[in-house]
Amino acid sequence: MTTCSPFKYFKTSPEIIRLAVMYYIRYPLSFRQVEDILHERGVDICHETVRFWVERFGSKFAGEIRKNRAGHHSNWQWHLDEVFVKINGERFYLWRAVDHEGEVLECFVTKRRNKAAAKKFLIKAMRKHGSPKIITTDKLPSYGAAFREIGVADRQLCGGRSNNRCENSHLPFRRRERAMQRFKTVAALQKFGSYQSQIYNHFNHQRHLESRQSFKQKGTTALTE
C-alpha cells in the first residue's frame, strides 16, 4: 500500500517548501524576511504561508534528519547545560545535551532547575541515546545529586572551559529567540527547541577543517537532502 505524500494538496513544490522552512529555522529570520528572500528568487508567497509551512513541516523535516544521524558509540562524551527562557514573564529552563562532536542530542524544558528536573532530563536522554562514557557539566549541584541517584556519579566531569561546547550550542537558539521576539507557550518552546536542534546538526560542519569549496558543497547538499 502506497503512502500519501504530505505535499499532495500543496501547489508549491516540496523543494520550495523545504527551502522556506530551512531558511526560517536555520537563520534568525522573520516570516516576512523569508517571504522577501523567496520573492527575490521569483517565488511569490505570503509570510503567513511560511508560518503555516513551518508549523506543518518543521517537525517532519527534523524527524527525517534524526533518522539519518549516527547512533551510540563506545567513547561517547556528553556535555550538559541549561539556559533560562522567559515565557510571559515566567522563567523556564531549556536543558541541552551535546556530544563531543557538537551534535545536539536532546532538548528538554522544565519549570525548575533542581535535582528532579536534572534527573528527568538525563533519564530521557539516556533512554533515547544510550549511556555515555563521560558526562561533562558545570558545577550546578542539581547535576551531582541527580547523577548519584541514577548511579553515574563516577562519569561526571565538572569544569569551566570543558563545557564550552554545550554553552556554544545555545548561541544559534538565542539568535533565533530574539528574531521570534520570545516564545508564547512552553509547548512552542519545546517543539521549536527539538526541531531547531536537528536542523542545526544537519548543517553543523567543521568549517575550520575544510576548504571553502568543500564547505559550500556540503551545505548545498544538506539543504537538498
Residue spans of the language-model regions?
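Short conserved beta-strand segments at catalytic cores or DNA/RNA-binding microdomains
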Residues: P28, N88-V104, L122-A125
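DNA-recognition alpha helix
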Residues: S30-V43
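Active-site proximal helix-loop segment of RNase H-like, two-metal nucleases, encompassing DDE(D)
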Residues: S169-T185, Q196-S197, N201-F203
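C-terminal domain-tail junction helix/linker
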Residues: Q190-E225
